[in-house]
């Protein structure tokens, strides 16, 4: 009886050990896969950041790109923390090639991180197509709203200091497109420009990323979740 109990105990211990090793091996493989996918998405995002287009209704220094798309793919497939990490790595890779002394990269990271984190956080709690849609829409809307204080308090003041650009000259670029838009709806010229141009532009940029994400996510899903 004692021999049987000892034999059974030894067998159970072996099973436990095997299952434990299998668990840690699976977890390690999963982490490795996540890091690999995140690295690839970061590289793609960095490349996309160089592919930018001018928009006729925006000042020439504001460009459109879809470099937030890989972070959106990452936040849905890997989690919100990975989405933020992809945004960080993307901008670090772009930093040596940028011409804004890091201001543009900082702004891009802050806005993109908010976008990816909120989208991923909502999807994490509501894992469905509807959850992904509402999460990404909420992320895009929040990014657009946050762009107002970031541009007003950080980006444009930094450009004035770093490049010696008069604020009136920056506002003039906006006015040249839509007349005296800088005089409505508030008495603050720069604030008006950001409200009329930058916030809607940032929202549309986010919505474009959302549309592209929903278009390509399913075909890429086997690679993202392999």
What are these language model-derived features?
Residues 2-226:
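Loop-helix junctions at membrane interfaces
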């Amino acid at each position: 009886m004692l021999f049987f109990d000892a034999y059974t105990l030894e067998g159970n211990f072996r099973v436990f050990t095997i299952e434990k090793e299998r668990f840690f091996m699976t977890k390690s493989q999963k982490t490795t896969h996540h890091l690999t996918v995140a690295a690839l998405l970061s590289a793609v995002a960095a490349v996309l950041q160089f592919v930018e287009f001018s928009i006729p209704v925006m000042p020439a220094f504001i460009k459109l790109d879809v470099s937030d798309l890989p972070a959106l793919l990452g936040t849905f497939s890997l989690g919100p923390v990975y989405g933020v990490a992809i945004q960080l790595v993307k901008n670090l890779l772009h930093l040596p090639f940028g011409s804004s002394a890091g201001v543009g990269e900082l702004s891009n990271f802050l806005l993109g991180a908010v976008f990816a984190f909120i989208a991923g956080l909502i999807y994490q709690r509501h894992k469905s197509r509807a959850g992904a849609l509402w999460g990404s829409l909420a992320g895009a809307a929040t990014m657009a709203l946050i762009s107002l204080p970031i541009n007003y308090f950080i980006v444009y003041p930094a450009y004035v200091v770093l490049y010696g650009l008069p604020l009136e000259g920056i506002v003039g670029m906006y006015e040249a497109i839509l007349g005296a838009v800088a005089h409505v709806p508030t008495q603050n010229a720069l604030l008006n420009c950001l409200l009329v141009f930058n916030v809607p532009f940032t929202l549309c940029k986010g919505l474009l990323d959302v549309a592209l994400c929903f278009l390509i996510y399913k075909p890429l899903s086997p690679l993202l979740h392999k």
